Every structure is written in structure tokens, then in C-alpha cells.
């Protein structure tokens, strides 16, 4: 491949040199004197010019041939190279063709310089230049073919190089895109893991704060198998409920007449009627509002923003001392509902936040630690008739005891009946044992005959 390119380049350089010599010879003639196209003047002058340019072309061909031989020597040193030029790598063709072309370019530039120096007014000089290429069609044809072959070869090589580079670029871009695509899910996974860890940490903190909220065990008078309600405490609790809690919470399951029952607040009958008259109720027969009577129940408070009914709240929160197990803890310590109510009423620390358009208040005893009910109690909010200091702790204890009574209004009677029943069963068991022993005594230990 290298030898062919070198020979073609030499032929092209020779042709260009001949054309340049002819043009220079025509330019040396005097202006106004022209020779016939077929005269011996042109033939005699063209021969020395050709003879002069031939050594120059040969001198130019010698370095090209030497370089071509050097290139062949380098190619033959490679083990993969063979004698056929077609098997050589396509990447070597541009390098081999460019070296001779670089040497042929100075000759072409010299020829162009001579043509530019020639006057444009000499038509006779142009005619021999046009005739001489026609005289050597055999030499021009290989040169043109070589130029045609070289011209497509270079674009093809140039096209092959970008084409070879483009797959590499696409291959490089593809891993880069894949890496970016992998990094994006990886970042999402990391963010999801971070968000999950943050959520777990928040949930753990919430659980820890809720678990850490200790509900203190208060020694109420009604706890234990022999406990009973404190009448004065129930009356104070009724006062706290009426003045503070009844605005948002009802006692729909508690009849007003039970306020006079033994074991409860034990209010006089006239006070019970006066207390009931403070609440109105719609008469189902006349469909008109009337004052309540002792046979009616406490009002039911319902509507948006109202709290739950407190009739059975002390038993609904009975999880402090059980409820699973043998029941001995509940027997001696109670069910834990009043302690929970007391803890909620005294568990506010003043912290609050706004969420979803609602204001929430931090409460250490409430599930989740945030409650929508504001702190209902404050010191000296209620004035007790018996002169007891109205502290938050005292009012919370009193109303918790009162709500325990509303959930268990017959607790003292139940305990009394239970105590009597247990004593009776103990006595009955003793009598049955003695009776059984008396009946089986003659059979187990018969008398011996005398």
C-alpha cells in the first residue's frame, strides 16, 4: 500500500512540474510574439524544461521512497503484517498517504506561484499548457485515478475515525448514564433509608416519651377491699365538675337522684332538686324545654369541639393496675382509672404547637403526648365551701374520685355485700366440714364390740 501511494505521488508531482515548466517557458517569450501551435519552438523548449523538472521530481521522489521504505520496515516488524497491502490496518493508510503529500505540496505551490506571475494577457501561453496535458493522457489518467483514490481514502479514514470515536463515546456515555441512573436510585434509597431511620427515631422517641410518662399511684380512700368513698371529697369533685368540666363533658349515664344515695355525695333531697333544676331538658311529650328533675340524668354534651362523655371514663382507663393477672393488684390498689385522670389533668407543661389548623398542648400522661384540650385547671379556680385549698393537684384528685363514683356508684354496697358473702361462705364451709366429720366418724372409726 505504501509503495503504490509513493509511485502515484511521484507521477502527480512530475505532471505538476511539467505543467509549471511549460507555463514558465511561455512567460519568458517577448510580448506580442507568438509561435504556431505545432512549431518546433514549443517542442524544443518543452524538452529542456521536462529534462530540468525530471531531476527535481526524482529528487523529490527519493526522500518519499526512503520514507516509504522506512514505513515498510516498521510495518514488516509487526507480526500481524502480511505481504498484501489490503490486509494492513486502515489506520495506517492516512499516515502513509499524508507523508508523500506533504512533500508534493511545495512543488504544487511553486507551480501555482509561477502561474500567478504569468500575465493573463498571453493566450498563446495558455494554449501549449492546454495541449501538453493532452499529449500525455496515460500519465494524467493514473494521476487523476490516484488523486481520486486518495481523495475518497482520506474522507473515508476521517469518517472512520469519528465513527470509531463515536461508539467509544457512546460506550463511555452509556456507562456514565447507567452510573448516573444507578446513583439516582441509590440516592433515593439512601434518602428513603434516612427518612425511615428518622421516622423510626421519631417513633422511638415518642414511644420512649410515652413509656417514660409515669402515672403515680395515688392512695384513694375507696381502694382496697374495705375502702369507701369520702363523702366530702365527692362533693368537692361534683363542684369541680359542675364549674369546670360540665361545659364540654357530659354524664349521660348518671341519674341526678343518685347524688342523694348512701355511698355517694349524699346531698339532701332539696339540694338535689335545686341542683337538677339548673339544667334544662326537652320534654318528649310537650316538646318544650323544662328544668330537670332528680329522675332525669345529667345532660349530654355533644357537638363539634366537645369532649367525650365522662360517665364511665374511670373504668374505661382501667389499665394501670391490670387488668390481666390474678386480680389481686386490682383488689388492693384499684383499677387505675382515677390515677390516669389525675395524671392527665396535672400533666400539662405549658408547651403547645399548631398542627392542621388546630392547637395542640403537650401532656406527658396522654397517649402521643399531644392533646387538643387545653389545661382545664388552675390554682384557686374553684372556691371550696369547706375551705380546702383549691390547688390543681387537689382539684384533680377530687374530680377523679367523683368520676370513679359515677363509674361505680354502687361500689361501697358491692364491697359490703362481698365482705358479708365471704364471711358467710367461711362460716358455711366450717359448718359443712364439722357436719361431714360428725357423719363419717362412726363409719371410719366404728366401735369395737365388747
From Swiss-Prot:
Pfam families noted in UniProt: Cytochrom_C1
Parts of the chain that traverse the membrane: 421-435
PANTHER family associated with the record: CYTOCHROME C1, CYTOCHROME C1, HEME PROTEIN, MITOCHONDRIAL
Keywords assigned: Cell membrane, Electron transport, Heme, Iron, Membrane, Metal-binding, Respiratory chain, Signal, Transmembrane, Transmembrane helix, Transport
Binding of heme c, residues: 245, 248-249, 373
Post-translational modification (record): Binds 1 heme c group covalently per subunit.
Chief subcellular location: membrane
Function: Component of the ubiquinol-cytochrome c reductase complex (complex III or cytochrome b-c1 complex), which is a respiratory chain that generates an electrochemical potential coupled to ATP synthesis. c1 functions as an electron donor to cytochrome c.
Spans annotated as Disordered: 24-210, 284-305
Bias-annotated ranges (Acidic residues): 59-77, 85-108, 118-194
Annotated localization: Cell membrane
Entry's Gene Ontology molecular function annotations: electron transfer activity; heme binding; metal ion binding
Quaternary context: The main subunits of complex b-c1 are: cytochrome b, cytochrome c1 and the Rieske protein.
Gene Ontology cellular component annotations, sorted alphabetically: plasma membrane
Topological category with respect to the lipid bilayer: Single-pass membrane protein
Low complexity composition bias: residue spans: 24-58
InterPro entries documented for this protein: Cyt_c-like_dom, Cyt_c-like_dom_sf, Cyt_c1
Species this chain originates from: Paracoccus denitrificans
Protein name according to UniProt: Cytochrome c1
Signal peptide segment: 1-21
Taxonomic lineage of the native organism: Bacteria, Pseudomonadati, Pseudomonadota, Alphaproteobacteria, Rhodobacterales
